[in-house]
Amino acid sequence: MIESVIIGAKRSPIGIKNGKMVGIRPDDLASQVVRGLLEKTKVEPSHVDDLVLGCAFPEGPQGMLMAKGVAILSGLPETVGGSVVNRFCGSSMDAVHQISSRIETGDIEMGIAVGVEDMFSVPMGGFNPDFHPELAEQEYYIGMGETAEIL
């Protein structure tokens, strides 16, 4: 079996409400991180086969297959694929798992997992939530902070 390994990690600063990062597009922020990762690891962009991006609310500035846009903005070749995974708070971890699985099955040799969330551009629940009444009555739709407290 082929083993997958993580050869590098990079992250952006965490923004605060009305802080200095207000107005930076999530795709620009993610592509800066990917460019920094490529620089840090000295990986040639042509060696990257795929990019999977985790995002809990892929709409608005985070929509329209943001992963492919991030790949292009990062300087990866147009041949590099891009997909978005939504597992809410687990989205980025799922992106790591997907890249790892694709490497271990021999589907790709190298991939990048990235996550991004612009909590100021996209409101909790998205732009047009339509919650199921029965689930809403049971308080099914709560944030991860509240969920963690309950668990």
Regions found by a protein language model. Name each.
Residues M1-V80, V114-L151:
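Conserved "HGTGT" condensation-loop signature of ketosynthase/thiolase-family condensing enzymes
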Residues V85-V116:
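Active-site-proximal alpha-helical scaffold in enzymes
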